[in-house]
Amino acid sequence: MMALYGKKDQEEHDTLDPIFGSLDEEQDLPKYQLNETPVEPRIAYQVIKDQLLDEGNARLNLATFCQTYMEPEATKLMSETLEKNAIDKSEYPRTAEIENRCVNMIASLWHASPDESYLGTSTVGSSEACMLGGMAMKFAWRNRAEKLGLDIKAKKPNLVISSGYQICWKKFCTYWDIEMRTVPMDMQHQSLDMERVMDYVDEYTIGIVGIMGITYTGRYDDIKKLDALVEEYNKHTDYKVYIHVDAASGGLYTPFMEPDIEWDFKLKNVVSINASGHKYGLVYPGIGWVLWRDKSFLPEELIFKVSYLGGEIPTMAINFSRSASQIIGQYYNFVRYGYKGFHEIHKRTHDVAVYLAKEIEKLGLFEIINDGSQLPIVCYKQKDDVKCKWTLYDLADRLAMTGWQVPAYPLPANLEDVEVQRIVVRGDFGMGMAHAF
């Protein structure tokens, strides 16, 4: 998430210290303005490296879903392709073909039908992928509604989603003037409440978002049940509603670990899916993917033809120029690991998560909210009947003193009084690190 910075964020000491023994030893470098003259490359390198010395260790950051390790060969390939602009497909046709292969591999994992014209694209991350999926839903809804004679200006269009949504959906609804209808979570329904979700749907609903890996807890929405509810609803109305699956976390994990779960394009009313390659696709940030089951669900007006890079290039993106290196990194992982390799990595991750959940539960202080048996996320709260003089926020601070970053936070709307702590187990977090933790 990009933060906003300005004058108020400047530090009181506004110069950088020079490097001992260098020719520039007496030259202070300003922090917030350009220096007047160049410095030697090694000076610039060392000054900046020194600024980063006291940052947290990314491997010990159990707050983030983002991948923090890749093999040296992958890193080498990515560093060798940093200068390639992914959007310039006529200049880099082999890179474009690699992106095409990745889309088709993911489509196969998500059971896209060869009888439908599925299509997809890479993105900067799942946030952009969600934006694209949301825009496609909005434009497709508008086209259908206008054909049916609905006054689309009479009310705001709306999007239905669990209150456990990731912040990108709030951004989407704000940026594109959509009413966000959130279905409250409770301790009984720690995912999308299937008993209530359809109460939020009407003729102005652009779509329903199901989540495969709720950010707060790691739980899955029951997409198969949601599909059945939508199917029944659509039988009795001309104003059809469809499902987008936000599988930022689960999209490149579930197919390898629980292939029998029905959540993807196997289900008739799931029309688009997004996933993060930089989560359980095992690539450094940032890379995401969004796919549609058929081109009929991606309105033509959202596809732009760009000719000024040489050749006419169709593009569906919010971002434009970006490095192709992350696409290359994703393809490396697909080639390197294959289906069995991804399964083995995720199985080890699963085993670590389950181990941690059991060990934390043995302490007798915590109630496990999510035990890592599906998505490898361990989430817990303090037991109501155990009196402690400390909070989960105190525990997070104490863990931070030893280098571990483990966030504590309240659950979303309707459960704000419940404070939890969450451990994200990634592919680079082995059993040895779990024992050390």
Model-derived features: where do they sit?
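PLP-dependent enzyme catalytic core of the Aspartate aminotransferase-like
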Residues: 233, 415-437
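Conserved PLP-enzyme active-site core in the AAT-like
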Residues: 6, 10-17, 121, 125-301, ...
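Structured alpha-helical segments in the cores of large, soluble enzyme domains
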Residues: 99-106, 165-170, 193-201, 319, ...
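Active-site C-terminal subdomain of aminotransferase-like
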Residues: 256-375, 381-386
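Conserved PLP-binding catalytic core of the aspartate aminotransferase-like
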Residues: 366-403, 427, 431
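Surface-exposed helix-capping loop/turn segments at secondary-structure junctions
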Residues: 108-117, 143-149, 360-369
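Short Gly/Ser/Thr- and Asp/Glu-enriched loop/turn motifs at secondary-structure junctions
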Residues: 116-117, 154, 370-377, 416-420
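N-terminal entrance/gating region of PLP-dependent enzymes' catalytic architecture
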Residues: 1-117, 403-406, 421
